[in-house]
Amino acid sequence: MSMTKINWYPGHMKKTKDLIKENMQLIDIVLEVVDARIPLSSKNPDITVFAKNKKRVIVLNKSDLVEKSEILYWKKYFKENNMADEVLEISAETGFNIRALYSIIDKVSAEKKEKMKAKGLRKVNTRLMVVGIPNVGKSRLINRIVGKSSAGVGNKPGFNRGKQWVRIKEGLELLDTPGILWPKFESDEVGQNLAITGAIRDEILPIEDISCILISKMIKYGLWDILKERYKLLDEDKSEVIGEILEKIALRNKMFNKGENLNIQQAAYTVLRDYRNCRLGKFGLDK
C-alpha cells in the first residue's frame, strides 16, 4: 500500500545525535534497546556507525509481544551479521530477563577488567551508554536496572530529561540519552513500522493510512480471522481496498460522529492501540 513518506527528525534529535557521538569516547559498552516487534526497523543505523569500535549489546525489549520463534530468529540474525557482541530479549514492563542483562554486561566488560587488573588497577569502572528510538522503553529499562525511578518515564515518544549519568552499582555507570530517530529512513516500510508501533507521534501522522497499512500486513500474514473476531467483521467485509475494511470496523462497532457519520479516525486509533497492547495477537512487522 502506498502512502506519503514518513519522517520525523526535530531539532532536538540532531543535538542528541551530536551528544551521543561526542560521548562515545567515554563509553565501554553501547546497549541499544530495540523494539522486538520491529528489531531491524527500530535499530538506528547512526548508532551502528558511532559504536563500531565499542562492545555492543542489543536488547530486544517488549519481547512478550511477539512469538518466541521471532525472538530466536532476530537473536541469530544480529549475531551472525556481527551487529552485536550479545543479544538479549527482555520486557522492561514486566521485568523479564533483567537479571540476565546484568550477567551479559559483566561478561562483555570482563575483557577490559582483565586488562586493567594486569596493569595493577584494582578499581575498574565500566561505562555503559543506553541508546534507542523514542518510546522503545529505555527509561523503564533503566528504572528496572537501577531499582528506582531515577529516569523520567513517559508513554509518548520524545519524553526524556536529557543526558543523564546513573550509577547502577560499584564499578558500573550508565549514561542515559534521549530517544532519537535518524534523518532519512531506508525505506517507506521502516517509517511505517515505526509509526505503527508508536515511535513517532500519532498527532503528526496520517493515522488512517497507518492503520490501513497495519490491516494490510495482518491480511498478508494470514491474520484475517483475528481482525474478524476482534471487530465483529464478516467474511464479506474482506476487501482489497483496505480503507473499506476500516469503514466496516467503524460500522460494525458503532463508531459514529455526532452527525451520525462513520468515525473512521476512531476506528483507526482503535486498531493501532489494540496492536500496540497485544490485543491482535503476538506478531512482529519486520519480515
Kindly give the residue locations of the regions a language model identified.
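Helix-rich effector regions associated with P-loop NTPase G domains
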Residues: 1-29, 37-38, 43-45, 50-56, ...
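Structural beta-sheet core signal
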Residues: 32, 58-60, 130
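Short, glycine/charged-enriched secondary-structure capping and boundary segments
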Residues: 45-48, 72-75, 102-104, 143-145, ...
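Canonical P-loop GTPase G-domain recognition
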Residues: 64-131, 150, 254-256
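Conserved active-site beta-strand-loop modules that form the wall/rim of enzyme catalytic pockets
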Residues: 92, 142, 172-175
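Alpha-helical scaffold segments in soluble metabolic enzymes
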Residues: 100, 104, 140, 213, ...
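Short, structured loop/turn "capping" segments at alpha-beta junctions
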Residues: 112-116, 143, 149-155, 221-226
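Glycine-rich phosphate-binding P-loop
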Residues: 127-147, 177
